[in-house]
Amino acid sequence: MPRSDGFSPRKNLRRSARDHSRSYAGQCNEDFDDMYAPSSRRRSSGGVDGNGYTRSGRKINHNRYYEEEYHEAISSEEDERRYRTRRSSNSMTYRQQVMQAIDESKRNQKVPPAKRKRIYLSDEEEEDFAEAAHVENTVPERATRRSTRRRSSMHEELGVSEQEESPVRRTRKAAKRLGSEQPEENLAADDPLPMEGGGEIVLPIAEIDGMAEQENEDLIEKIGREEEEEGAEEDEQSGEKDPEEEEDDSSNAESSEESTAPRQYSLRRRQPVVQFNASEARENRRARLEHHRVANQNRHHRNRNGSRRRRSDSDSDSDDMVLPRPDKRQSRPHMHNRGERERGRFMPINMTEKELQSAQHILMDRMRKTDAGQGASDIDPMSVDSSVGFDQVGGLGHHIQSLKEVVLFPMLYPEVFEKFRINPPKGVVFYGPPGTGKTLVARALANECRRGANKVAFFMRKGADCLSKWVGESERQLRLLFDQAYAMRPSIIFFDEIDGLAPVRSSKQDQIHASIVSTLLALMDGLDGRGEVVVIGATNRLDTLDPALRRPGRFDRELRFSLPDLNARRQILDIHTSKWEENKPIPETLDAIAERTSGYCGADLKFLCTEAVLIGLRSRYPHIYMCSERLKLDVATIKITSEHFGHAMRRITPASRRDLTIPSRPLDERTSILLGDTVSNLISLRIPQGYRCVENAMATASSELEQVVRALEPNPTVPAIRLLLCGSEQLADGGQTSYVLPAILAKLDHLPVFSLSVSSLLTDGRPEEAFSNAIQSAMRASATGPCIMLLPSIDEWIKVIPVSVQHMLITCLESMTGFTPILFLSTLDTSFEDAPEYVTEIFRHANCITLNPSRRTIRQKYFEHVIEKINTPPKVFDPTVYEMPLPDDDSPDSKPSRKLNDDETRELLKMYTALQRQMRLFFKERLTRLMRDRRFVEFVEPVDPDEAEDYYEIIETPICMQDIMEKLNNCEYNHADKFVADLILIQTNALEYNPSTTKDGKLIRQMANTLRDAIDDLIECELDESFVERIETVSRMLQDAGVTPTSDKLLTEIPKGFARKKAWSMTNSLAKEIEQWTSEREAENQKMLSKLGVAAPTLELVVVPVEDMKSEEGTSTSTDGVPASAGNKKKLLKKKKGQKKSKTGESEEHDEDSTVEDAGEDTIVENLEIKKNQETPNSEHDIEMKDASKDSTPSVQISIAEKELIVSKPATCELIQCCVEKSEGWSVSELERLSSVLSHTIERFRDEWNRENLPAQLTQIVREWQTADDSNNTIVNGTLNKSNGNLANGH
C-alpha cells in the first residue's frame, strides 16, 4: 500500500528500543500483552548468534537495522493464548476490532498503577544503573500531545510533584549532557535489578510511561495489522508470494511442537520516528486508503507511465524500490505524444482509403515482412488535386514521354526487361528555374498512376520532412520511407527540393547532413535491391546536389525544365483558358499575349490569367467593390480582352527579371520603331537557323505518331557562333547592351542562357568557381541542343574580373569545336576600332555587328508616336455605362456560401435534431404543468359549440392547450416564438370573446390574464435565451450550406446574412429582429446607390453648362435669376422640390479632375423645372444618360456638357519637326529620355479641354534639352543654349 510519509505503518506504531527494553526488564510475563509474537511464530530461539524473526515471521539475520546482540524476554502460555485470540480477531471487521480495542483499553484502566518504592543501590550497582540509563537515553525522545497528557496523568496518580527529581531523572539529565561526548553503545536488556537485601524490582518512570502507552499501541497496532492484511491481499492478486513466507508457514507446525520453555526474542535497533496523535493517525489512514483505492483503479496508467512503488513487508525503515522497466518512448521522447499508429505511417498520396483497403491483405503481408510502418513520420499525406493530369501540362511533351519510360513501361511490359537482362531507370531528377512545372508534373504523374488496373503508390516528401534534431532519426525516417514504398511496390518516391536533403558533402558541412546523404545513397543503390521503387527529385539548383547522386543507378536521367518558348506559352494559355467557354479571348489575342510574355514561366502565365479575369470583373461590375452584400452578376457579360491582359502584365514581374541574371526583355511598341528592323535583320541574317527555332523532330512532326517515331533522330547540326554587338564611330552607344541584347534574348527564349556577367560571377566572392560552374553547365546543355553563353559589356568586364578568369575564358573558347552548338553573344560599348586588345583576340572583325544612329524617317515616326497622345480627349466618367446589379441574397439559383464536408454536415444535422428535441420536451413539460393547473381548466379543451354558439364565428383562429400539445407531438414548432404566440393567442381569444360586463366573462378574462402572467414567468425564468439563439445559429448554418433536414424543419424565415444584435426574449422575438435588420439593410443599400450615382425614384437631375468658363470673378444666372458660382469647370445641378443632393453622388458624376475645390460654392436651385423651350443655346451638346438598370427601375436623365478639344495642329507639326532636327545623331537612350519627359508633360494635360499652350511648352522643352555629350551650355548643332538659367533636360 502506498504511504505518504515514507515510513512503514508498523514503524509508526512502535516505540524506541529503549522503551521496549525497560518494559521487558520491569514487567511480568502477563504484562507483555500481544506486543511480540509467540513461539509458534518463531523458527528457533536464535539467542546466541543473534538470528531472530519479527512478529510476522520474517527472518531478521544480517539486517543493518538489527543489532547482533539481543534482549531476552520470557514468553508464557498466556502469551500464546493472547496471540491466538488476536489472530482470530483478524476475521472481524474494522469496526468490531476498534470496539474490541476500546473495551480492552477500558479494562486496562481499571488495573491499579504500580507503586513506586525508594531503593538504595551500592556504588557498583549505581554505576551499572547509570551506565544502562545513559545507553537507554542515547536515542532522543520526542513527546507528543498524547504521550504528554498520559505521562502527566500518571504523575498525578502517583503523587509525584513536578519540582521533585528522582535519582533516575538526574541520571538521565546527566546522560543527555554527555551523550554527544561518549560513543553510542548497543542497547542491551539486563535482568531485573534486585535490591540489596532481596527487595522488590525497581521500576523507573520511563518504564511506567511505556506501560501507560501500551493500550494506545494496541488500538493503533490493530489498524496497522489491517493495513498489512490489505497489502497481503494486493500481493495475492498480483500472483506473487514471498518464498520466505512460504518457508515460515511450513515451519509453523514444527514451532508449535516445541516446548513451552522461556523463549528469547531478538530485538533490533530502530531509528526514531515522528509520532502523531490519534486524530492525525486516522486522517493519514483515510488518506492512504483513498490513495490506495485510486491507485487500484488507475493501475494500468501507473504501470505505463513508469515504475510503481510497491508496499514493503519488511520491518526496515527503507522501502523496497523496483527499478523501472525500460520504455521505448523514453528512448524516443519526440515520439511520446504521437497520434494514432495509422497516422504515423508513410501512406501514398494518390490512393484513397477504399483503394488501400481493397489490397489490405497484400500490403499487410508485405509490411509484416519488411517491418515497415512502425512509428514512422508524423506527417499527414498531402492532398493532391485529382483533376491534374498529363493533359493539363503544356510544352513538356518530352518530359512526359521520359517519365512513361521510367514508370509505366517496366510495369506494363516486364518481359522486355527480363529478355535483355536489364534494369529499367529508377531515378529521375527535375531541375530548372522556379515555376517551370516540376511539381506540376509530379502531381500529374501521381494522378496518372491512379488510373488503370495497375495502380502505383506515390509518396511525396519535402526535403525538410525527413530532417530531425534527434541523432539518427532522419536516417530512420528515410529507411522507413523506403521500406514502406518497397512494401507497396510498385511505387514512386518524390522528393521536392531535394537539395535541402542531400547537398554537396564537404569538410565544412555538418556531419549530420553527410550521414543523411550517405544513407540516401545506400538506399537508392546499395547492397539491397530497391525493387520496383522509382525515386524522383526536384531542385532549383542542380549544382548543389551531391555528385554521387547524379550517376546511373541512382538518378539515371536529368530533365531540365526551362522557361517556355513561344509554342509552349501558347499551349499553357490554351490550357488555362480552355474552360472560359464564351468568355475566352479570341485566338489572335492569345497569340499576341504569347509573343509579349517572353521570359514568363508557367506559374507566371497562370497568374496572368487570374489577374486578367479580376481586372475584367472590376471593369464590368465595379459595384461589388463598394458593397459588402452579394449582388446578382451576369458572368456571361464579362469579356476578357487584350487590354485586361495588358493591365495584368504591369502587375507581374516575370521569372526572367526576378533574378536579374538574364536581361531578357522584348521591345515595346515605342522602341520597336527604332530597333525593330535592326533586331529582325540581325536574327535572320547573322544567327543560324538552328538557334532561331527548334528544328527537332517533335517540333516539325505533323502527328503524335510521327513525333514518337522521329524523337530518336539526332538534332540538326548547329555551328558555333560568336557575335559582338558594338557601336559605330559616330555613335558609341547604339543601344546594343540596354535594348538590342535583351530583345535578341527575348526572341531566342527557347534556348537555355548562361550568363558570364559581372553580377553573376562576383555574387559569392569566388569568380573562378562561378565561372567554371557556368561553363560546365553550358557544355552539358550543348550536348542536348543549342544554347547561349552571354557576356554583356565586355570592355567593362575585363576591368573588373581577375586576369585568371580572363585566361579561363580564352581557354574555354579555344577548346570549343566548330560543331559545339553554343552562341557566344557579347556587347561592346564602343566601336570595334577602339576596342581593347583582349576583345580583338576573342572576336574577329567578321563577328562584329555595328549599330548606326537612327535615320530621320525613323525618328519622325518615333516622335509622332510619342506626341500622338496630345490629341486624345479627356475621359468623361459616365455611370450609366456600368449597370447596377441587384442583390442576390434570396435568389434560388445562388450557390451555398458555406461548404461543409460529410462529417460536418452529419454533426450539424445531429446537433439541430437534438436541439429541437430538447425544445419540444421543455415545452411539453411546461404545457403539462399549465394543463394540470385548475385555474386554467377552461383553456385545456376546445370550446363547446353548444355552450357558445357564435364562438367560432367571432374567433377566427380558435386554439386550446390540447391543440398546442398536438402540434408539439407533430413537431410543428421549430422556434420558441411560435409556441409562445399560440399560448398568447389563447389569452387574446378569451379577451376578445368574453365581455367584461358579465360575471362569467370577468372570471374568464381574469383566468386569461393569469395565464399570460404564468406564461411570461415560465418563459422568461426557465427558458435559456442562449438555447434559442443556438437553434437559430445552427439553422442558419444549415441554410448557408444548402442542407435540408428530413425530420425537423429549418427556420426558413431567417434571411441569408442575418445576425442578431440583441439577445432573444419574449419582447425581442425573431420576427422583430429580422424586421429591424431588413430596415437597416435597406438603408445601407440606399446609401450604396447614392455612392454609385443612382438617384432615388423621384429624383431628376439636369446639368446646365456654365456660360463663361474663363472668367475669374463672373457669375452665371439661372432662368429664375438665382446666382450660381462660376468656378473652373463647375456644373449646376437642379432638383425637384423636397429632394436634397448628396455630395457623394455629385462627385461621382463629375470627372476626377473637374471636381470643385469647395462643394459649398455650388448653388443648388430648387423648385425649378427646365422645359425644352427653356434650354440654353449649348443644350445641343448635352448627353442624356441611359437607364440605370434594364429592369423596371426608374429612369434618371442626366445631361453632361460635352466640349470640344482645342489643340493647334500646326503647332504640333512644328513640335515634331523640332524634335527630329534636335535628335540628329542621338543614341537610343537619349531619345528615350526625351520621350519620357514629353510624355509626362502631356499626361499633365490629359484632363484639359483647352490645350493651345501645350505644343509651345513641349517645343521649349526640346529646344532647351541638353544631351549627355553637351558641356559648357552647347548642344549638338553648335548653337548656344539661350536658357542658361534653366535646368537641363526639363528637370
Swiss-Prot record:
Tagged with keyword Transcription: yes
One Pfam family per UniProt: AAA_lid_3
Start-end of Acidic residues biased regions: 226-257, 1148-1164
Domain of life: Eukaryota
GO MF term list: ATP binding; ATP hydrolysis activity; chromatin binding; histone binding
PROSITE patterns given in the database record: AAA, BROMODOMAIN_1, BROMODOMAIN_2
Annotated Basic and acidic residues bias: 64-82, 1168-1190
SMART domains hit by this protein: AAA, BROMO
Compositionally skewed regions (Polar residues) per UniProt: 88-99
GO biological process: nucleosome assembly; nucleosome disassembly; regulation of heterochromatin formation; transcription initiation-coupled chromatin remodeling
Membrane-spanning parts: none
PANTHER family in UniProt: AAA DOMAIN-CONTAINING, TAT-BINDING HOMOLOG 7
Primary role: Thought to form a complex that enhances transcription from repetitive DNA sequences by modulating chromatin structure.
Record-given protein name: Tat-binding homolog 7
Taxonomic lineage: Eukaryota, Metazoa, Ecdysozoa, Nematoda, Chromadorea
